[in-house]
Amino acid sequence: MPRAIVFDAYGTLFDVHSVLARCEAFWPGKGAQLSQLWRAKQLEYSWQRSLMGRYAPFSQVTEDALLFSCEFLALKIDGKEKQALMDEYRRLALYPDVSAAMKKFKGVKRAILTNGSPDMIDPLVAQSGLAFDAVLSVDELKIYKPAPQVYQLAVDRLATPKEQIGFVSSNCWDALGAKSFGFTVYWINRTGAPVDRTGFQPDRIVKSLDEVLL
């Protein structure tokens, strides 16, 4: 049994597409398209910045991705709309299965390991009502997941060998990055997607957090 369980935040505990309603309110008929592209560019920019060695906080990456997405989709966005959407990212909804499922993980260290910068992740955790032993941000290292040194941060801060850490993510690229590093990995595959072909496999594939059994 793992001595610690580490969770990704965005897309795993918090639904990144809970911004869709506000997107749709601003641009009727375009909300879903904007939400999807915004998330895709957010990830792309984080990886690109890591490869270039040009770190910027996740809040900046998220804003840049939003502005690109609006430009690409020919959606005019003003300062108030931009701020409203950025504020939405600081109050994303928990997935419905999260609160009850977290009660199962008593007796082990619990942590979040996230690409989110403190100005984005701290408000989310505070409003969630969830308790963690640590909330770890890549902002300390200035590089994004799936860089191995990010997963090492969890080992160091939790003072737990990687072989005794369970890692939970709904993002396959993150799950496989954690597996490559040496964690026991639970991939929450909510959409029934195939495993990415990178030479690694999650230890267990589940459909929701409440299926994760240590």
Annotate each language-model stretch with its function.
Residues 41, 107-108, 131:
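Structured helix-beta-strand junction loops
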Residues 32, 40, 46-83:
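A metal-dependent, Asp-based hydrolase signature
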Residues 1-43:
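Active-site neighborhood of HAD-like aspartate-dependent phosphohydrolases
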Residues 21-22, 37, 64-68, 84, ...:
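Alpha-helical elements of Rossmann-like donor-binding domains used by nucleotide-donor carbohydrate transfer enzymes
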Residues 1-5, 99, 103, 113, ...:
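Asp-based, Mg2+/Mn2+-dependent phosphohydrolase catalytic module
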Residues 27-31, 72-77, 128-131, 159-160:
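Short helix-capping segments at alpha-helix termini
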Residues 55, 59-60, 77-112, 116-118, ...:
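Short, acidic loop-to-helix structural element flanking the phosphoryl-transfer center
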